[in-house]
Amino acid sequence: MSANGAASAVAEALCDARAEDVCVFDVSARCGWADFAVVATVPGLLHGTHRLVCEQAARFGLREVHRKKRGLCEEQWRVLDFGSILVHLMSAQARAFYDLDRLWQDCLVAR
């Protein structure tokens, strides 16, 4: 499956998990380390959604590239690195503050 297809499948899984305002961005022309970024607002704790995304990604042969120990600050924003796909799980407050949607507004593939 292509990176585009995998990013779309991850976005669909996030929607099924009741994540809000899920967006897929094609960032390949703007960043050298990933092709797609999926950004989602997650109500509640992020770790359950993190696990679900990893399970869905594994179905497409994707594994987290740079997995690190998680800290308390990551209950506001977690970045999951699957190589060509970055998944940003954010609280509503973190999403409003960092405003990745504005940063990548010209790269939007799907909302």
From Swiss-Prot:
GO terms for molecular function: ribosomal large subunit binding. InterPro entries: Iojap/RsfS/C7orf30, NT_sf. It holds the Pfam family RsfS. Coiled coil: none annotated. It comes from the Bacteria. GO terms for cellular component: cytoplasm. It is found in: Cytoplasm. Functions as a ribosomal silencing factor. Interacts with ribosomal protein uL14 (rplN), blocking formation of intersubunit bridge B8. Prevents association of the 30S and 50S ribosomal subunits and the formation of functional ribosomes, thus repressing translation. This is Ribosomal silencing factor RsfS. It comes from Treponema pallidum (strain Nichols). The lineage of its organism: Bacteria, Pseudomonadati, Spirochaetota, Spirochaetia, Spirochaetales.
